[in-house]
């Protein structure tokens, strides 16, 4: 009797909650391993870049003794394992070292650049997610018709076009030919909201184009599956109005995978904007990494790249957690 009761409790809400905790814990552990491997790759990549750190700072004509002294001061002459251990320990504590170019803490530059990239990414996110969901749902409700085919073709075409190609086309059309929008995304610190949006419009559009196809396809697939589900047929047989069936039964289940995809893409929007930010002279994390690589500013480069890795990994972790927490069936199935 006691065995039966304990088994039923384990299979009840408490057991389900424990499975969710184990699932999330496993994902967190895998994310930490991923970040550790990324830190090793980033550190090794910085060490493999050509050029001497001291000479890159002091110049090619610097006295060799001054170069050696600077390398010793920066710790560049220590064993690689010692350098890595000290570097990753400081990074975890929020200390990314001093920039070789500006001789100021890297963390302040990375924090400011990340905030700018987040602004650009969130702006693109709040534009593309409603458009992608609306397009995908509308296509699913007209499956097989010309509207469905048109949305699918537009979404696929926008997805496969590289960001730098769409950025250049937008610059030529709206910045050079029509002169409707400024090419430079940089705006004065005291600029109003309209001026800010005007300067950010061109950098946002390539991101909207790229991610519209992903989100629209996921929304369409989820909606088609939900429309064919038994609970939807039951709701229709009960005589519920079409708009009630769509909003109460179809969308609630169809948008679960779309939400997780959108959360994952948000991480990329914030951290993967090197090309867009460079083309539009936007002071984000992508352009910071590009400029650091050109200047051989290793602390800035390593801090920026690892920060992007953290953002993307956390976004994936949040997406996985949302998918499990919002889907009761997957909550049990994925945890077992």
Annotate each PLM feature.
Residues 45-46, 54, 58, 71, ...:
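Conserved protein kinase catalytic domain
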Residues 34-85, 178-199:
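Hydrophobic alpha-helical transmembrane segments of membrane transport/permease proteins
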Residues 18-22, 32, 38, 108, ...:
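Alpha-helical transmembrane segments of integral membrane proteins
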Residues 41-48, 78, 89, 153-184, ...:
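Membrane-water interface segments at the C-terminal ends of transmembrane alpha-helices
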Residues 54, 93, 166-167, 224:
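Alpha-helical transmembrane segments and their lipid-water interface positions
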Residues 8-45:
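Charged, compositionally biased N-terminal leader segments and the immediate start
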Residues 45-49, 57, 61-62, 91-92, ...:
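Hydrophobic aliphatic residues
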Residues 2-20, 77-133:
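An internal, D/E-rich "acidic patch" concept
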């Amino acid at each position: 009797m006691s065995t039966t009761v304990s088994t039923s409790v384990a299979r009840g809400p408490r057991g389900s909650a424990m499975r969710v905790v184990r699932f999330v814990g496993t994902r967190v552990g895998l994310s930490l391993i991923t970040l550790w491997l990324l830190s090793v790759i980033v550190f090794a990549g910085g060490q493999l870049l050509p050029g001497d750190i001291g000479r890159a700072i002091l110049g090619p004509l610097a006295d060799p003794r001054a170069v050696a002294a600077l390398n010793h001061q920066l710790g560049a002459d220590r064993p690689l394992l010692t350098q890595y251990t000290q570097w990753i320990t400081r990074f975890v504590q929020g200390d990314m070292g001093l920039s070789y170019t500006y001789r100021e803490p890297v963390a302040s530059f990375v924090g400011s650049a990340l905030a700018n990239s987040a602004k650009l990414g969130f702006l693109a996110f709040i534009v593309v997610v409603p458009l992608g969901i609306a397009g995908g749902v509308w296509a699913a409700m007209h499956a097989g018709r010309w509207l469905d085919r048109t949305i699918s073709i537009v979404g696929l075409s926008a997805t496969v076009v590289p960001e730098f190609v769409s950025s250049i086309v937008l610059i030529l059309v709206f910045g050079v030919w029509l002169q409707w929008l400024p090419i430079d995304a940089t705006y004065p610190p005291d600029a109003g909201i309209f001026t800010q949006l005007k300067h950010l419009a061109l950098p946002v559009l390539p991101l909207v184009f790229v991610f519209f196809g992903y989100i629209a396809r996921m929304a369409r697939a989820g909606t088609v599956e939900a429309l064919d589900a038994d609970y939807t047929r039951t709701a229709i047989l009960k005589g519920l109005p079409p708009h009630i069936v769509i909003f109460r039964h179809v969308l609630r289940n169809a948008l679960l995978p779309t939400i997780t995809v959108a959360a994952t893409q948000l991480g990329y929007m914030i951290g993967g904007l090197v090309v867009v930010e460079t083309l539009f002279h936007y002071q984000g994390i992508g352009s910071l990494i590009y400029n650091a690589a050109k200047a051989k500013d290793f602390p800035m480069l390593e801090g920026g790249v690892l920060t992007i890795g953290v953002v993307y990994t956390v976004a994936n972790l949040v997406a996985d957690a949302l998918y499990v927490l919002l889907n009761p069936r997957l909550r049990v199935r994925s945890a077992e």
